[in-house]
Design a protein with these regions (language model features):
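Alpha-carbonic anhydrase
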Residues: 2-251
């Protein structure tokens, strides 16, 4: 599958601040008649949004320690990247070459993007922002690494300091990032994580997504948070029922 097709497939991982369309041409939003409560009624392709039993995001609590969980192997590299305001979020499309290995499977990094506030919560508390690093295996499986971010007045995020000056403010605009971008700069020192099986967090809400959420949060400055929220005041989906799913925690 070519990269543009992958990007369309994964568009549901982003969210919108005003009514936008998916690759099916169907509008969806986070408020009003196009909002989450009606997603499943907007298009037959969105049915999982209403009836799916493995939906994301979820509240992370009572995670069970599983000492057998393997570390996530990161093989990220610096390279050219393009930033786009896709009408859902600010998305960075990365050059080929960065990937993770998890449970013996290689997942190539396709893109990363942001949600404000975070989609997922920890014991009922949302974070100020989250970056979702979206990966795809050779056989089409999706794995998303989530890094929660918390506002810290005196500590800007180094990678955001590189990215934000190029941030496109108008839907459809793209910008080449002048510096090389290494997504590894987002990763916390402590690689402990939570994991569960979920879905894309927006239409079509496709299930079977492997979620890997770091337990350690990373900082961003108030100014960095405001710069994003000025474009997307809210682009996150309400929490979904676990329906008996278990959340596991690594050591």
């Amino acid at each position: 599958m070519r990269l543009p097709a992958v990007a369309l497939l994964l568009a549901g991982l982003a969210c919108v601040a005003s009514a936008q369309t998916t690759s099916t041409g169907t509008k969806w939003d986070y408020i009003g008649k196009y909002g989450p409560i009606n997603w499943g009624k907007l298009d037959p392709a969105f049915k999982a949004c209403s009836v799916g039993k493995e939906q994301s995001p979820v509240d992370i609590r009572n995670a069970k320690l599983n000492k057998a969980l393997q570390p996530i192997e990161f093989h990220y590299m610096a390279g050219p990247a393009e930033m786009v305001n896709n009408g859902h979020t600010i998305q960075i499309n990365v050059s080929p070459g960065s990937y993770i290995v998890y449970e013996g499977v290689r997942y190539d990094l396709v893109q990363f993007h942001f949600h404000h506030p975070s989609d997922e919560s920890v014991k009922g508390k949302l974070s100020d922002m989250v970056v979702h690093l979206v990966h795809k295996s050779a056989d089409g499986k999706i794995a998303v690494v989530a890094v929660l971010m918390t506002e810290n007045r005196g500590q800007p995020n180094a990678l955001l300091s590189t990215l934000w000056p190029s941030m496109p403010k108008v839907v459809g605009q793209t910008a080449k990032i002048s510096d090389m971008v290494n997504p590894g700069a987002f990763l916390p020192a402590d690689r402990g994580y939570w994991t569960y099986t979920g879905s894309l967090t927006a239409p079509p809400c496709t299930e079977g997504v492997k979620w890997l959420i770091f337990q350690q949060q990373m900082p961003l400055s108030r100014e960095q948070l405001r710069a994003f929220s000025a474009i997307y005041p809210v682009n996150s989906r309400p929490l979904q029922d676990l329906h008996g799913r278990k959340i596991e925690a690594s050591e």
